[in-house]
Amino acid sequence: MTGRVAIVTGGTGALGQSVTSRFLSAGATVWIPYVVPAEVEALKARVGAGASLHCAHADVTDETAFGRFVQSVLDAHGRVDILINGVGGFAGGDLVSTRLVEWDRMLTLNLRSAVIGCRGVLPAMTAAGFGRIVNISSRAVVPPLGGFIGYTVAKAAIITLTQALAREVARGVSVNAVLPSTMDTPANRQAMPDADRSGWVSTDAVAEVIGYLASDAAGMVSGATIPV
């Protein structure tokens, strides 16, 4: 991954920090769009603030804002090699009790952000003849679980997006998805203090799978949906 240029959306979150650390350690340059400055400081406290890490304010659910962000990356490096669509959100609720505004929020955070991300980088990747896109779905959608239907539907759509887009992209560009089970994060520990965490997966373990899919070695893997 030495010399590769990566965009990691959601890079200030728990999984995003692990992915960013993994990529920086492998020699990549990482660009992260953010909206909360304090989260950037937390990221830098973990991975450092070296010359290979770039953070710029951009809302990835706003196509115009993300387009400007991508152009900044292209202006600096001339290419975007890797996109990790790591932005997402969770909310519980069944079909009847989930308000439409919450449906919209789940679709915006989990699906719209990924669509905008892919649309933003694909022209440059296609022109270069190289690209790695990794989307984040969830094991909760295979098979779909009830009780948090807005989240489930949005993450299931990520699988369809991944598989369909893998058939649309040019040679040299791959599109894959990882499906984490419950991740061991501070937020999940707080939300489920009495849960059995023996089956939870670490964010570093998920980042290792993402790292492989983003690597040059994974060029023949596309359209895969990998549970972790």
Describe the residue ranges of each PLM region.
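Conserved glycine-rich Rossmann-like NAD(P)H-binding loop of the short-chain dehydrogenase/reductase
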Residues: A26-L43
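C-terminal helical subdomain
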Residues: A170-V173, A177-V178, T185, A195-V228
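Substrate-binding pocket helix/loop in short-chain dehydrogenase/reductase
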Residues: D94-L95, E102-L107
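Active-site helix of classical SDR
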Residues: C118, A154
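Residue(s) in the substrate-gating loop at a strand-loop-helix junction
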Residues: S138
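Conserved glycine-rich cofactor-binding loop
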Residues: T12-G13
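Alpha-helical segment proximal to the catalytic Tyr-Lys
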Residues: P123, A166-R171
